[in-house]
Structures are given as structure tokens and as C-alpha cells.
């Protein structure tokens, strides 16, 4: 298989494509997140008036989606390629299609469809008008026009593209099982598959997420993260009229932490339906407070 069609080659091509469009190519955020949207380069930078273009790979964790490595396309740990463009360019769809062509998808031979699917993140207090992109009947990407993040209206509106890298690679390579994906494009004994890299981790983390994660410790961690977030927001609050907030990002880290701990508790099955909504609201309140703090920083547009 050509290097370009390998899993890592796909990532490199997307990075090169979006760098050519003026995006800063960032690295994954160094915290456990449920989706690429949680990266502050998207959530926080979508707020405020300042222009922003960025692209990055983000490992994402959804503990409840683990299947002990036995499901061919369902994972508790997977990769997204995220693009955020603010203000939203008028040719976002054309840029997206050009990126598919760059990774080797022949747009004339394949059935490319956009299916309306508005996006919402209850924990981030965010929503947007969106479409899923289907290639020959398989969803491979989503693009969204952010209307609101952390409870604040997005002005200007930002355009966001999310590529599901495993699904996209399965489509490009024509494989039915994610663990059969060619990871590095090498031949013979040097060939590495997705399963070689991640199958054992999927098996082990599924056991952790469903069976072994210490729930008493997780409840404490949630409370600690919630308290730390509020403490940092208070400590960084402006001390004079017109001053800037000084700790929006450390506080947001704790919001991310609380969200992931909640997802682990949810996977362990120790949160009831009514409690679940309460926890979502608690994380949302943290996200809103962090968004308000961000808007009082230089990057958030404060004078």
C-alpha cells in the first residue's frame, strides 16, 4: 500500500493540506478529552472576535464505547482530525471536498453526500448548524457552523471540520475491520497494522472502564476538579475595572478533567438517569464560567 493511504500518511496529508490554507498545525492537547472539540484551540478560540485558523489531531476517549477489541469499528479510544476556521469561510464545503481529493478520494467515482445533522454538546453548552459527510453510505466527517459555545453566541461564526480518522482510513483503504488498517504503509516485516498498535490497549482499557476503575476515587476526583476550576476562576478574576482574567486556561483544564471523570463514572454504571443530567449540568456550568473568563483575556478579545 502507498504511504499516502496509510493511517499515518492520511494524517500527514491532511496536515499539509490545511497548513496550505493558512492553519496553524497544533499538537494534540495533553489531557483526556471526549472529542477534538474540547481542545482549547476550538472551544475557547471559537469565542471572541479574533480570527483563528488551526488544525490538529486529537486522541479522543469515550469509555462507554469500548468493546474489548471485539467490535470491528467501535472504539473507546480513537482519533479525530479537527479544523477550526474563524471567521467561517464562504467556501468551507469546497475546501473540505478538496481535502478529500488530496487524500486520494476520487470525487467523480464516489457518492459524496451531505446529510443535515445539527451538532450539540450539552457538557460544553455548545451547538451549531451542521452536516455529516457520507462517502458511499459511510459517515466519515462532520462540519459545523458554531452558533454558541459555553453558552455564548459565536461572533463571528466559526466553521469546524471533524474527520473521523479511523473511519476515513477504512474507507480509503477499503477494509472492514479497524484493526486491519495499514498504519505505516510499509511492506513485509516492517508493516504495522492499527491492531498492532492499539488492540491490546482497547482490551485493557475496556476492562478498566467497565470493571476496574475505582468509583469512590472517581467521585472524589470529580468533586476536586469542580472545586479546582472554581478556585482558579476566582484566583484569576480581574482585580480592577477593565483588567483581564489571568487563569482562564488552567480553570478550563479542570473542566475537561471533570468531563472525563464523569464519562468514566457513566461507563461504570454508577450514575442514575437523574444524576446523569445533574452531572452534565455541573460540567456545563464550569464550561460557561471558563468561557466568560476567556472573553476577559487578550486572546478572547478583551481590550
UniProtKB/Swiss-Prot annotation:
UniProt keywords, alphabetically: Aminoacyl-tRNA synthetase, ATP-binding, Cytoplasm, Ligase, Nucleotide-binding, Protein biosynthesis
Keyword Aminoacyl-tRNA synthetase part of the UniProt annotation: yes
EC numbers for this chain: 6.1.1.14
Protein location: Cytoplasm
Organism, as annotated: Methylobacterium radiotolerans (strain ATCC 27329 / DSM 1819 / JCM 2831 / NBRC 15690 / NCIMB 10815 / 0-1)
Pfam hit, one: tRNA-synt_2e
One GO MF term: glycine-tRNA ligase activity
Source taxon at top rank: Bacteria
Family: Belongs to the class-II aminoacyl-tRNA synthetase family.
Gene Ontology CC annotation, any one: cytosol
Family matches, as PROSITE patterns: AA_TRNA_LIGASE_II_GLYAB
The organism's taxonomic lineage, starting at the top: Bacteria, Pseudomonadati, Pseudomonadota, Alphaproteobacteria, Hyphomicrobiales
SUPFAM superfamilies on file: Class II aaRS and biotin synthetases
Quaternary structure, from the entry: Tetramer of two alpha and two beta subunits.
Protein name according to UniProt: Glycine--tRNA ligase alpha subunit
GO biological process: glycyl-tRNA aminoacylation
Reaction equations catalysed: tRNA(Gly) + glycine + ATP = glycyl-tRNA(Gly) + AMP + diphosphate
Amino acid at each position: 500500500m502507498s504511504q499516502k493511504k496509510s493511517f499515518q500518511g492520511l494524517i500527514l496529508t491532511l496536515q499539509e493540506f490545511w497548513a496550505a490554507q493558512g492553519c496553524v498545525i497544533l499538537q494534540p492537547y495533553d489531557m483526556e478529552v471526549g472529542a477534538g472539540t474540547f481542545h482549547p484551540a476550538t472551544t475557547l478560540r471559537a469565542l471572541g472576535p479574533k480570527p483563528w485558523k488551526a488544525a490538529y489531531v486529537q486522541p479522543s476517549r469515550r469509555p462507554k464505547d469500548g468493546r474489548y477489541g471485539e467490535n470491528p469499528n467501535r472504539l473507546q479510544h480513537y482519533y479525530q482530525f479537527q479544523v477550526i476556521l474563524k471567521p467561517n469561510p464562504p467556501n468551507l464545503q469546497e475546501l473540505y471536498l478538496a481535502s478529500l481529493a488530496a487524500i486520494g478520494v476520487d470525487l467523480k467515482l464516489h457518492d459524496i453526500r451531505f446529510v443535515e445533522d445539527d451538532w450539540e454538546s450539552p457538557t460544553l453548552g455548545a451547538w451549531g448548524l451542521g452536516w455529516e459527510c457520507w462517502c458511499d453510505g459511510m459517515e466519515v466527517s462532520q462540519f459545523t457552523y458554531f452558533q454558541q459555545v459555553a453558552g455564548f453566541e459565536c461572533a463571528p461564526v466559526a466553521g469546524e471540520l471533524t474527520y473521523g480518522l479511523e473511519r476515513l482510513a477504512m474507507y480509503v483503504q477499503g477494509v472492514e475491520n479497524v484493526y486491519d488498517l495499514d498504519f505505516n504503509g510499509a511492506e513485509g516485516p516492517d508493516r504495522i497494522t492499527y491492531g498492532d498498535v492499539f488492540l491490546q490497549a482497547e482490551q485493557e482499557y475496556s476492562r478498566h472502564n467497565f470493571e476496574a476503575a475505582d468509583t469512590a476515587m472517581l467521585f472524589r476526583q470529580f468533586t476536586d476538579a469542580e472545586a479546582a476550576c472554581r478556585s482558579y476562576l476566582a484566583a484569576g478574576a480581574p482585580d480592577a475595572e477593565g483588567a483581564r482574567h489571568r487563569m482562564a486556561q488552567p480553570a478550563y483544564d479542570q473542566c475537561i478533567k471533570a468531563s472525563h471523570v464523569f464519562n468514566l463514572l457513566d461507563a461504570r454504571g454508577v450514575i442514575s438517569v437523574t444524576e446523569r443530567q445533574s452531572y452534565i449540568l455541573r460540567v456545563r456550568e464550569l464550561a460557561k464560567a471558563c468561557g466568560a473568563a476567556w472573553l476577559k483575556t487578550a486572546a478572547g478579545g478583551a481590550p
